[in-house]
Amino acid sequence: MSNESFPETLENLLSTLQTKQQNAIQSEVIEWLHSFCETFHLKIHCHKQFIPSGEKKWAKIPTQETQENTQPHVQRVVLSRAQPLKVQESLLTTMCNGLVLDANTWTCLAVPPPAPFQQVTRQIQHYYRNNFYEVVPIQDGTLLTIYYWDDPEHGPSWCLASTHGYDVSNYCWIGDKTFAELVYELLQQHSTCDVTLEKKQTRGTRLFFNNLNRDYCYTIGIRHHNLQPLIYDPQNIWAIQTTNLKTLKTVYPEYHGYVGIPGIQSQVPELPQYELPYLIRSYKTAMNQAKNAIKNGKKDKGYFNYGYLLVSRAPAITKSISTVLLKSPLLVFLQKSVYQKKHNLTSSLRLEFIILQNYLMQHFRDNFIALFPQYISYYTKYQNMLNMIIHSIAIKDIDHPFAGTVVKKVLEDIENAENIIDHTTIQNYVHQSKYAMLYLSIISHF
């Protein structure tokens, strides 16, 4: 199917889905939406998954959902990116960055900021020289869009949409606090809004806002040390945008007509229009600046340069390059070492795995502990563990009471590679990050 047969604006997409729903069953509409997403390299996640016949790339429907209905009714869908943004994309596909739709009415529930472009092209340099962009410092945090939803089973509440999830209210990243609890905690500290947190075993954690307009969705950024464990950069919450779900008009905190969450500050002030090469040079030293600040005990966000956002003043002209993300080396390191989701880990194990994996990677080890000195005791524990494993491998103790499986696996890898089993070889092998999950299974003994 050619790209021309698909809509190119959000309004047209919604209109197309609504028209199709009038003339077909919901499963056929969802199947068309899957085709749309596949064509433009997007991902779709459903509240209750529908699988088009003959396709095997989506997960199977759980048995309990198929006993009474072979095609479960979908309540919500979220459209997100499957790959980085390209220059020639339409404004619609840039908006599929955590776009949540009501699959009953095919209206918007949550409209996030557009996906950013992440390269500096000649076209971007041209627009920048001609003053098309505002420059905004990046704040290291998590982007969430708050929207109202009347759940058919559990009743109404305000939900938290992320880039890939229609509601992460009950999701934990590090530790046992859910996103709803983290947002509530930050709102209590930094806002004046009237919000309550509900905790129920059957429904989990939910937020209730008593003074927000249900016809709007509210995009915020949050920085909490359960999500961003660089504790020298303080926790915070800030406003990014609100969208009128009836008109689909988005307004930013700095503009007239903004309807926000009471007491939450706007993102950050606009910076002067420096020359682009100077702007890029200015964040090249971000890693050393951050490490020096931490070494000297400085707890202030001013010491942490994550890069800059170029935000277009004329998105109708700049189109898919209306938001440009310029990451500093500090942010790149944090994304690779901490934020990228690795393996299917529980929230109780994620922090341990992150620290362990960084310890095992020689090119990450020193920078990680310089940014996160609170974890130095973990490094000592890992060194003790690896010393024991190295000794056990050297004597081929595959029957070790708790590390036998680890010893056997590493020994097999060394022998299969036809390497000589000496101290240097063993040491090189046990420090490989590919064994992190294996080590995680015995870490409680240290």
Curated annotation (Swiss-Prot):
GO terms for cellular component: virion component. Induction: Expressed in the early phase of the viral replicative cycle. Its main location: virion. It is found in: Virion. It comes from the Viruses. Keywords: Early protein, Virion. Belongs to the asfivirus M448R family. This is Putative RNA-ligase.
